[in-house]
């Protein structure tokens, strides 16, 4: 009896949700038709007036009233009166005293491909050929089995890397493969970078560096593995049918 009531409520819930979605309609956007709000072309209702040669009171070729080629009245090609292409007056083509000018330089458009490329590059800042650069770590305290190497490490630990290069953990079958690859690329990259600065490494340096980087790579693997499994658990949790049904019911209560 209880199961039948629960099934009925679930059925009513989904019917109500689909009915509510079906009744929703798009509202028409406010505003007029095409080209409302004034013309965008010069000389048609724009605040700067007509952009073509003015036709004043005088006739064509007359000495007054703005005739074509005349010294007064703002004629076409004259130094006064705001004629076409003139340095004075209002409403001249290409002048600073009007709005909506033809030759106003357009603002540079942002290239979306460049933006997307920059975003992608920022995701692996410091990366190297498909490898990611881990966060800085404190150099581990390691005992090498003899006093000389222990003392050498304490005195020279600043010369060794405090970050490691690695690939995502899902590209490896086990921890050993991850650590092996991580140690090789990190030691190689640090050695090349340091050598170009004029500093060389001895055999003792390489031996100690490999041990130090190995411990750091193990730590990096543990961090990445934990984060990877947590992401996977979250996806499984929110994709289960009971959780989806519960979320749908809560959304229905909020919207309804």
Swiss-Prot record:
Residues 54-95 are annotated as: 5 X 8 AA tandem repeats of P-H-G-G-G-W-G-Q. Its main location: membrane. Cu(2+) 1 binds at residues 64-66. GO terms for molecular function: copper ion binding. GO terms for cellular component: Golgi apparatus; plasma membrane; side of membrane. Residues 25-233 are annotated as: Interaction with GRB2, ERI3 and SYN1. Cu(2+) 4 binds at residues 88, 90-91. SUPFAM superfamilies: Prion-like. Cu(2+) 2 binds at residues 72-74. Cu(2+) 3 binds at residues 80-82. Residues 234-256 form a propeptide. A lipid is attached at residue 233 (GPI-anchor amidated alanine). It is found in: Cell membrane; Golgi apparatus. Residues 28-110 are annotated as: Disordered. Glycans are attached at residues 184, 200. Sequence repeats lie at residues 54-62, 63-70, 71-78, 79-86, 87-95. Transmembrane segments: none annotated. Gene3D superfamilies: Prion/Doppel protein, beta-ribbon domain. Disulfide bonds join 182-217. One of its GO terms (biological process) is protein homooligomerization. It is a lipid-anchor; GPI-anchor. Monomer and homodimer. Has a tendency to aggregate into amyloid fibrils containing a cross-beta spine, formed by a steric zipper of superposed beta-strands. Soluble oligomers may represent an intermediate stage on the path to fibril formation. Copper binding may promote oligomerization. Interacts with GRB2, APP, ERI3/PRNPIP and SYN1. Mislocalized cytosolically exposed PrP interacts with MGRN1; this interaction alters MGRN1 subcellular location and causes lysosomal enlargement. Interacts with KIAA1191. The normal, monomeric form has a mainly alpha-helical structure. The disease-associated, protease-resistant form forms amyloid fibrils containing a cross-beta spine, formed by a steric zipper of superposed beta-strands. Disease mutations may favor intermolecular contacts via short beta strands, and may thereby trigger oligomerization. Contains an N-terminal region composed of octamer repeats. At low copper concentrations, the sidechains of His residues from three or four repeats contribute to the binding of a single copper ion. Alternatively, a copper ion can be bound by interaction with the sidechain and backbone amide nitrogen of a single His residue. The observed copper binding stoichiometry suggests that two repeat regions cooperate to stabilize the binding of a single copper ion. At higher copper concentrations, each octamer can bind one copper ion by interactions with the His sidechain and Gly backbone atoms. Belongs to the prion family. It is linked to Found in high quantity in the brain of humans and animals infected with degenerative neurological diseases such as kuru, Creutzfeldt-Jakob disease (CJD), Gerstmann-Straussler syndrome (GSS), scrapie, bovine spongiform encephalopathy (BSE), transmissible mink encephalopathy (TME), etc. This is Major prion protein. The lineage of its organism: Eukaryota, Metazoa, Chordata, Craniata, Vertebrata. The gene is PRNP.
